[in-house]
C-alpha cells in the first residue's frame, strides 16, 4: 500500500529554528500543539486535482490566519482555483533598506487517491500510531501546516524582522501550476518583486537506521516537451508498407528511450 504520512512532531524543527532567532523568548508549545489538529483539518478539505477546488483550502487557511489576527489576501485564477498569501513586514535599517524577502510556499492541491489501496479514508486525516494519514500529508499540506505554525510563531514573537516574510499557498501544482504560481507570476508580479529566498517542497526529513536526516534540495530537473513528426508513403492495412510513418515514429521513440543523457551537476 502506498502511504502518505507525516510525523506529529514534524513541525518542531522549523519552530525551534524560529525560536532560536528571536531576541525575546516565546513559548512555542501552543504552536506545536496546534500543528496536528490543524493538519488533520486541512487533510479533510478535498482539494484533489483535478478539479482542484483550492479555494476550499484558501478558506481553511484564511480562517486560521484570521484567528491569529494576521491579515491575508487571496485571488482566484479561475472559478474555484484559489491562491492565498500573507506577509509579515520587515523593519528597514538606518538607511531605509530591508533584506530580500523570504517566501514560505506550498501548494494546496493534491493528486487523486484510490481509496481501495488505503487502509484509511484518504481524506480523513486519521491518526494511527503517532502518524497522520491522508492525501497530501507529505505533498504538501504537511509542509503547509509546518510553515503556517512557524509563520504564526514568528508573528507572535513580535520580533523585528530584517526582511519581509511571506506565507503563500497556491493552486494547481500537481497539474502544471498554470492556475497557481504560474498565474501569479504573470498577473501579480509585484508579489515577487523583492523576493530573494523561497522555501518550497523537495527536500524532506528521512528516518534512517543511524537517525533522522534533513534532506536539502537546491534545484530540480525541468521538463523538456518535444513533438515528434514522422511522414511516409500512405497505404492500406491489408497490405502495409515495410516502412511507414508509424514505424518511423516508433523507431525514433525507441532511440530516445535508449539514449543515455550525461549527468550535469549544477553547483549549489
Task: Briefly describe each language-model feature range.
Residues 2-12:
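Bacterial N-terminal signal peptides that target proteins for export
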Residues 10-20:
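Bacterial N-terminal signal peptides
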Residues 21-25:
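Sec/Tat signal peptide C-region and signal peptidase I cleavage site
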Residues 26-135, 154-163:
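Acidic/His- and Gly-rich active-site-bordering loop/insert found
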Residues 81, 120, 162, 193-194, ...:
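Short, solvent-exposed loop/turn segments at the edges of secondary structure
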Residues 131-132, 138-215:
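Acidic/histidine-rich catalytic neighborhood of metal-dependent amide-processing enzymes
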Residues 189-193, 203-210, 217-223, 237-268:
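Acidic-enriched catalytic cores of C-N bond-cleaving enzymes acting on peptides and small amides
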Residues 210-212, 229-236:
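Flexible glycine/proline-enriched surface loops and loop-helix/loop-strand junctions
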Amino acid at each position: 500500500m502506498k502511504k502518505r504520512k507525516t510525523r506529529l512532531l514534524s513541525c518542531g524543527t522549523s519552530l525551534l529554528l524560529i525560536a532560536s532567532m528571536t531576541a525575546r523568548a516565546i513559548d512555542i508549545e501552543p504552536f506545536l500543539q496546534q500543528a496536528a489538529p490543524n493538519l488533520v483539518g486541512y487533510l479533510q478539505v478535498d482539494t484533489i486535482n483535478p478539479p482542484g477546488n483550492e479555494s476550499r483550502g484558501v478558506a481553511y487557511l484564511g480562517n486560521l490566519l484570521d484567528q491569529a489576527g494576521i491579515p491575508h489576501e487571496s485571488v482566484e485564477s479561475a472559478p474555484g482555483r484559489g491562491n492565498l498569501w500573507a506577509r509579515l513586514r520587515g523593519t528597514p535599517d538606518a538607511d531605509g533598506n530591508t533584506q530580500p524577502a523570504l517566501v514560505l510556499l506550498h501548494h494546496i492541491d493534491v493528486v487523486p487517491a484510490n481509496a481501495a489501496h488505503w487502509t484509511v479514508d484518504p481524506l480523513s486525516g486519521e491518526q494511527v500510531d503517532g502518524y497522520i494519514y491522508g492525501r497530501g500529508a507529505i505533498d504538501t499540506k504537511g509542509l503547509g501546516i509546518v510553515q503556517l505554525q512557524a509563520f504564526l510563531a514568528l508573528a507572535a514573537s513580535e520580533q523585528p524582522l530584517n526582511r519581509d516574510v511571506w506565507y503563500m499557498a497556491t493552486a494547481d501544482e500537481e497539474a502544471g501550476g498554470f492556475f497557481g504560481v504560474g498565474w501569479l507570476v504573470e498577473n501579480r508580479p509585484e508579489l515577487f518583486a523583492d523576493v530573494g529566498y523561497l522555501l518550497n517542497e523537495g527536500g524532506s526529513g528521512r528516518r534512517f537506521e543511524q537517525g533522522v536526516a534533513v534532506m536539502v534540495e537546491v534545484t530540480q530537473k525541468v521538463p523538456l516537451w518535444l513533438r515528434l513528426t514522422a511522414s511516409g508513403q500512405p497505404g492500406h492495412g491489408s497490405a502495409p508498407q515495410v516502412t511507414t510513418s508509424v514505424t518511423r515514429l516508433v523507431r525514433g521513440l525507441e532511440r530516445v528511450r535508449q539514449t543515455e543523457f550525461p549527468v550535469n551537476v549544477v553547483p549549489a
